[in-house]
Amino acid sequence: MAEKSFNLYRYSIPVDSQLILRDRFLKRREGLIVRVSCSRDGWGEIAPLPGFSEETLDQAQEQAIEWLTTWCNASCDAPRVPLDGTYPSVAFGISCAMDEMKGYLQAEGNYHTAPLCYGDPDELYAKLASMEGEKVAKMKVGIYEANRDGLIADMFLEAIPDLQLRLDANRHWSLEKALQFAAKVKLQHRKRIQFLEEPCKTQALSREFAVQTDIAIAWDESVREPNFCLEKEPHLSAVVIKPTLIGSIQRCTELINQAHSLGLKAVISSSIESSLGLSQLARIAQQYTPNVTPGLDTLDLMEYQVLRAWPSSDLPIVDLESEFITKII
């Protein structure tokens, strides 16, 4: 009979000094690395996102140790220990480790990313020229003036005729501001906006924005609200799934299947995980949303990769002996 074991590590990686989350600078990305073993190993990342996750890293660590200890004290063929009631980041990281250990998480990943739009359109065009499949990029809006955001989005769409844009407003706009944005985007360009995530402060205002502008919208923050119910709506084209903020792989696949049954696109997206977590998100995307470009273009915000390399990245990789990683158990 195989013996169970687990380890837990804590990492702290320097990030881009310009990274702002919810109006505050994030100087380091911190999280937990979990290893589980029962005949074979599985790894996962537990990394609550400051300002977005309901749980702190310390709370996640305490809960992860409790869950892993319970799991470890049972035999390998014992019924699965449920993840119900655990924090989203804990449920996601542990489910990744368990599915990897059991061989449920396929090895192949979708490493095509939607690059972030900023700077010179020619530089973005060079990135997109080498991409296979749909040429899609992402642009954050709502931080600067709505008029400015609209002009820049329209500039990219004008400069790159086959570009599809995904926009993310994080509920920053009033309806008036959102309409100011749309006014700067030419009518013929609006259909190449795949979706605008949560343009307004409420779902009702976002729906009204979509009706008035004919710009498709997507739910992101709404998915994580209590009693959220995904329904088919006239201008809703996608649901954005951030597993670190939502929960286990099983919970995420339920949402994916629900979206697909309604004819909606499901997009796996990053919560600024390390390369370990990002590579597992790429595998989840390939396994469950194989024809959709995931939103995972966040690794360059970091100064290092953790344990596993992201294909094509030349960032240095740190291992368990690194000064950036501390063993807890």
UniProtKB/Swiss-Prot annotation:
Higher taxonomy: Bacteria, Pseudomonadati, Pseudomonadota, Gammaproteobacteria, Pasteurellales
Function: Converts 2-succinyl-6-hydroxy-2,4-cyclohexadiene-1-carboxylate (SHCHC) to 2-succinylbenzoate (OSB).
Protein name: o-succinylbenzoate synthase
Primary enzyme class: lyase
Pfam family, one: MenC_N
Catalysed reactions listed for this entry: (1R,6R)-6-hydroxy-2-succinyl-cyclohexa-2,4-diene-1-carboxylate = 2-succinylbenzoate + H2O
GO molecular function: hydro-lyase activity; magnesium ion binding; O-succinylbenzoate synthase activity
Record bears the keyword Iron-sulfur: no
Assigned EC number: 4.2.1.113
Annotated metabolic or biological route of this protein: Quinol/quinone metabolism; 1,4-dihydroxy-2-naphthoate biosynthesis; 1,4-dihydroxy-2-naphthoate from chorismate: step 4/7; Quinol/quinone metabolism; menaquinone biosynthesis
Active site positions: K140 (proton donor), K242 (proton acceptor)
Family: Belongs to the mandelate racemase/muconate lactonizing enzyme family. MenC type 1 subfamily.
Gene3D superfamilies: Enolase-like C-terminal domain, Enolase-like, N-terminal domain
Keywords: Lyase, Magnesium, Menaquinone biosynthesis, Metal-binding
Required cofactor names: a divalent metal cation
A GO biological process held by the record: menaquinone biosynthetic process
Annotated positions binding Mg(2+): D168, E197, D220
NCBIfam families in the record: menC_gam_Gplu, PRK05105.1
Originating species: Haemophilus influenzae (strain ATCC 51907 / DSM 11121 / KW20 / Rd)
